[in-house]
C-alpha cells in the first residue's frame, strides 16, 4: 500500500471518528508524528501498517473501515450523443485561434512561480488537462526563465488523442531549450494521473508504460523521433463512452515518458518507473478541468480534492474556470433568456473541497482572493474596425462561436437556434455595444503549508 493510500485511509478514519491525526498516530502506533512523516514520503514497516489497519478495524463498528464521505454519483449524460462540448474540434480550434485565453491563463499561472519552493531533485509540475499544450508550453518557457539550471519533471493528463499530438509538437523546442526535463503524458483519471497509478487492479494489470530516450541534440532530431510515436498512440491512446455515465473514459491506461538520452544520468532519480512513481508537485495547473454545469460536489470530489492531495509541502494548485458577467454571457442570454451556466463560484467550490478533504485539509490553505486579484479578462482578438459599424459575418460568427463555446451550449440546442439568423443579429448588437467581446475567468489557489 502506497503512502497516499495510507494517508487517505487515516484521513477518512480521523474525519469519521472526529480525531486529530496526531492522536491517531499516538494511539495506533505510539507515534504522534506518523502522518507528518507519511506526508514527507517516509516509509513505514509492514508491522506498522498492520498495526494501523488493526487499530482502524478494531475502532470501527463491525470491524470495517469507514465509508467514503460525500459520495457523488457520476454525471449522467446520453451515451448516444450530447458529448462534452469541448470535444467538438471545430468549435474548439476556432475559439483558441480567435481568443487570447491560452496566453492570459499562462500569464496568470506564471505568477505562481514566484511563490513555489522547489526541492531537489527537480521542480515538479502537473497539468490537469493539457489540451493542445499551449498553456503548458508557455508556462515551461517562464519556468526556464526563472529556473534555468533546475531539472524539471513535467506531467500532464489528456484524454484526447488529437490534443496529445498537438502537445507533442511543442515538446522538441522545450527539450532543446531546457535539456534537463522529463516530460510525461497520461490518459488516466484525475485521481490516478498525478501518481501514474490506476486505481483499479484490472486497469493496472493492463497499463501500457512507454519510455522514450530521445537521441541527438537538436529540436529537429527530437521532433523526428517523437513523430514515430504516431502508430503507438493511434493503437493505444483510445477512449470509449462509459455506458454508465456517458462520459469519455480510457480503454487502457497509458503513460508516455520522454527525456533526452544525453541527460539520462542527471535525470535518473527523476524519471518515473512503472509501479514506482510519486506525486509531490510544486505546481498543479487546473485550468477549465470540469464542465461549466457540473455540480460543485462532482468538481470537489472527482477533480480538485484528488489534485490537492498531490501537492508537496509548499506546493500550489491554481484552479481557473469561467466566471460570466461579461459580454459573452450577454450574447447567450439574448438568445436564451435566463441561461446561467456559471452558477458555481470559486468560494462554493473551495468550501466543498475543504469538506471533502476532511482532516487532510488542515495542512492546506484555501485562497479565493478578492475579485480584483482572482478575476481576469481575455478578449476575442479582432481589429477595431471589425467590431464596429457594419460587422461582417465572419467576425459575428467567430464571436458567436466563442460565446457558445465558453457557455458550453450543447449541439442540439445550437442546431435548433442557428436555423434562423437571429443569433448573429444578437451577437452584432453586443459587439457594437461594447466595441468588442471579452470574457472573465476566475482563479483560486490551494497551497500546502511548508514544513
What is each stretch, according to the model?
Residues 314-322:
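Conserved beta-strand signature within the Rossmann-like core of class I S-adenosyl-L-methionine
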Residues 36-53, 386:
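Short, basic-rich loop-to-helix N-cap that marks the start of a DNA-contacting helix
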Residues 120-133, 154-155:
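Conserved class I S-adenosyl-L-methionine
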Residues 330-369:
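Conserved Class I S-adenosyl-L-methionine
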Residues 76-120:
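Class I SAM-dependent methyltransferase Rossmann-like catalytic core
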Residues 134, 141-279, 402, 406-419, ...:
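Class I S-adenosyl-L-methionine-dependent methyltransferase module
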Residues 263-269, 291-306:
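A short, conserved alpha-helix within the catalytic core of class I
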Residues 276-278, 298-313:
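A short glycine-rich, Lys/Arg-flanked "PGG" loop and its adjoining helix->strand segment in the class I
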Amino acid at each position: 500500500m502506497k503512502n497516499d493510500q495510507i494517508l487517505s485511509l487515516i484521513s477518512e478514519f480521523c474525519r469519521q471518528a472526529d480525531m486529530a491525526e496526531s492522536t491517531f498516530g499516538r494511539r495506533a502506533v505510539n507515534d504522534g508524528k506518523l502522518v507528518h512523516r507519511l506526508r514527507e514520503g517516509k516509509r513505514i514497516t509492514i508491522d506498522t501498517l498492520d498495526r494501523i489497519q488493526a487499530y482502524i478495524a478494531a475502532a470501527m463498528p463491525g470491524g470495517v473501515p469507514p465509508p467514503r464521505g460525500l459520495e457523488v454519483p457520476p454525471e449522467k449524460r446520453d451515451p448516444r450523443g450530447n458529448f462534452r462540448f469541448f470535444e467538438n474540434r471545430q468549435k474548439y480550434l476556432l475559439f483558441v485561434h480567435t481568443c487570447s485565453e491560452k496566453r492570459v491563463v499562462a500569464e496568470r499561472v506564471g505568477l505562481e512561480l514566484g511563490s513555489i519552493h522547489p526541492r531537489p531533485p527537480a521542480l515538479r509540475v502537473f497539468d490537469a488537462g493539457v489540451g493542445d499544450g499551449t498553456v503548458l508550453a508557455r508556462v515551461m518557457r517562464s519556468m526556464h526563465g526563472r529556473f534555468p539550471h533546475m531539472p524539471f519533471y513535467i506531467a500532464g493528463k489528456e484524454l484526447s488523442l488529437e490534443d496529445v499530438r498537438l502537445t507533442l509538437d511543442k515538446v522538441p523546442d522545450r527539450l532543446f531549450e531546457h535539456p534537463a526535463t522529463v516530460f510525461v503524458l497520461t490518459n488516466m483519471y484525475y485521481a490516478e494521473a498525478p501518481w501514474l497509478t490506476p486505481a483499479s487492479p484490472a486497469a493496472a494489470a493492463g497499463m501500457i508504460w512507454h519510455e522514450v530516450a530521445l537521441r541527438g541534440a537538436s529540436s529537429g532530431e527530437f521532433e523526428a523521433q517523437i513523430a514515430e510515436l504516431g502508430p503507438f498512440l493511434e493503437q493505444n491512446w483510445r477512449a470509449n463512452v462509459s455506458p454508465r455515465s456517458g462520459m469519455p473514459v480510457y480503454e487502457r491506461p497509458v503513460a508516455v515518458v520522454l527525456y533526452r538520452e544525453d541527460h539520462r544520468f542527471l535525470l535518473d532519480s527523476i524519471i518515473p518507473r512503472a509501479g514506482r512513481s510519486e506525486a509531490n508537485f510544486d505546481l498543479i495547473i487546473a485550468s477549465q478541468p470540469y464542465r461549466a454545469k457540473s455540480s460543485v460536489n462532482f468538481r470537489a470530489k472527482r477533480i480538485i480534492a484528488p489534485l490537492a492531495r498531490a501537492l508537496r509541502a509548499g506546493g500550489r494548485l491554481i484552479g481557473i474556470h469561467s466566471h460570466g458577467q461579461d459580454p459573452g454571457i450577454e450574447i447567450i442570454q439574448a438568445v436564451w433568456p435566463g441561461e446561467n451556466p456559471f452558477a458555481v463560484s470559486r468560494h462554493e467550490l473551495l468550501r466543498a473541497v475543504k469538506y471533502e478533504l476532511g482532516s487532510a485539509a488542515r495542512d492546506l490553505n484555501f485562497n479565493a482572493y478578492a475579485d480584483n486579484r482572482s478575476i481576469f479578462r481575455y478578449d476575442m482578438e479582432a481589429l477595431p474596425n471589425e467590431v464596429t459599424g457594419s460587422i461582417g459575418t465572419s467576425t459575428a460568427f467567430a464571436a458567436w462561436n466563442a460565446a457558445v463555446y465558453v457557455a458550453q451550449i450543447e449541439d442540439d440546442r445550437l442546431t435548433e437556434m442557428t436555423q434562423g439568423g437571429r443569433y448573429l443579429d444578437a451577437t452584432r448588437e453586443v459587439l457594437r455595444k461594447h466595441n468588442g467581446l471579452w470574457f472573465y475567468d476566475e482563479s483560486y489557489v490551494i497551497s500546502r503549508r511548508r514544513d
